[in-house]
Amino acid sequence: MAEDTYSHKMVKTNHRRCRTKFTEEQLKILINTFNQKPYPGYATKQKLALEINTEESRIQIWFQNRRARHGFQKRPEAETLESSQSQGQDQPGVEFQSREARRCRTTYSASQLHTLIKAFMKNPYPGIDSREELAKEIGVPESRVQIWFQNRRSRLLLQRKREPVASLEQEEQGKIPEGLQGAEDTQNGTNFTSDSHFSGARTW
């Protein structure tokens, strides 16, 4: 109860980015593109951003949210590449998609990760003010900070869902669950420790 009250106060006092509201015409363009290509590459997202006059990061988040609402699963890279290569000659559109430039994964230094992780432990749901302050402190765009926090929350939630099963199996073998020993995928914002303030899934 105390933790819930604490989280509520944090969210209430921390300003959040206003939700991007797209016009009917913008949504028509986005939905049409989504129906053809639910996993657009970086070049496509840049083109869409110019076409509807918004930031590329807003396009990326819109596609992420829409895929989540429609139950899309992240496609394995190997499967995607194999599919593109096998169909590329017969379908120019697929060939173009496979060659399309993608945004490079943001790589953080140890110092930047330390700052991000420390901030996450204090507040897993930072508002726009906190994210902009973090972005300025570590020298990256605010949109990268937002995505880092999103990835960290979703992966931590997934790990916690798996922990009960893993704990039971390891307990039967008399071992300590590996997932509870602090394994971390730092570049993607994933910390698997169980002492975080993270309290479950939440929609941005």
Swiss-Prot record:
Expressed in embryonic stem cells. It is found in: Nucleus. Pfam families: Homeodomain. Residues 73-101, 163-204 are annotated as: Disordered. The keyword Chaperone does not apply. Belongs to the paired homeobox family. The gene is DUXA. Transcription factor that acts as a repressor. SUPFAM superfamilies: Homeodomain-like. PANTHER family: DOUBLE HOMEOBOX PROTEIN A (PTHR46123:SF7), MIX-TYPE HOMEOBOX GENE 1-RELATED (PTHR46123). Keywords: DNA-binding, Homeobox, Nucleus, Repeat, Repressor, Transcription, Transcription regulation. Its main location: nucleus. One of its GO terms (biological process) is regulation of transcription by RNA polymerase II. InterPro entries: HD (IPR001356), Homeobox_regulator (IPR051306), Homeodomain-like_sf (IPR009057), HTH_motif (IPR000047). Transmembrane segments: none annotated. One of its GO terms (cellular component) is chromatin. This is Double homeobox protein A. One of its GO terms (molecular function) is DNA-binding transcription factor activity, RNA polymerase II-specific. It comes from Homo sapiens. Residues 15-74, 101-160 bind DNA. Residues 81-90, 184-197 have a biased composition (Polar residues).
